[in-house]
A protein has these predicted regions:
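Two-component/phosphorelay signaling modules centered on CheY-like receiver
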Residues: 5-23
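Acidic catalytic/metal-coordinating carboxylates
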Residues: 27-30, 53-56
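Active-site beta3 strand of CheY-like receiver
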Residues: 38-44
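Receiver (REC) domain active-site loop signature in two-component systems and cognate sites
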Residues: 49
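Short, conserved "switch-loop" micro-motifs in signal-transduction and mechanochemical regulators
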Residues: 76-77, 88
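C-terminal output helix
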Residues: 80, 98-107
Length: 113
């Protein structure tokens, strides 16, 4: 999972770690390093981060491995941003704050493809 807010990483990690092995990054550069090194099965990616734009990170991730499903997340509820994330290769788009049960459902759906 990639998010610049440690609180979000902590919430997701605590919730998802019972089912999945979870690795996190707080910025796009580190996330790309982890994708290169570990080839994760699924990525939760904050689209609105400082530094490298989340959409640019998504595009770079898809160049590294187009088969890895990416679920785009952000505080901004914006249909244009959601559409752009999907256009760039995101499996789905999910606004913060999270409904953790639905997030689990999205993860399972993405991994079953």
């Amino acid at each position: 999972m990639v998010d610049d807010e440690q609180e979000i990483i902590d919430i997701l990690q605590e919730h998802l770690a019972t089912t999945y092995d979870v690795t996190s990054a707080r910025d796009g550069r580190r996330a790309l390093e982890l994708v290169r090194a570990t080839r994760p099965d699924l990525i939760f990616l904050d689209i609105a981060m400082p530094g490298i734009n989340g959409l640019d990170v998504l595009k770079a991730m898809k160049q590294l491995d187009p088969a890895i499903p990416v679920i785009a997340i952000t505080k901004k509820v914006n249909t244009a941003l959601a559409a752009e994330a999907i256009k760039c290769g995101a499996f789905s788009y999910f606004p913060k704050p999270f409904d953790l049960r639905y997030l689990e459902h999205l993860a399972a759906s993405a991994l079953s493809r």
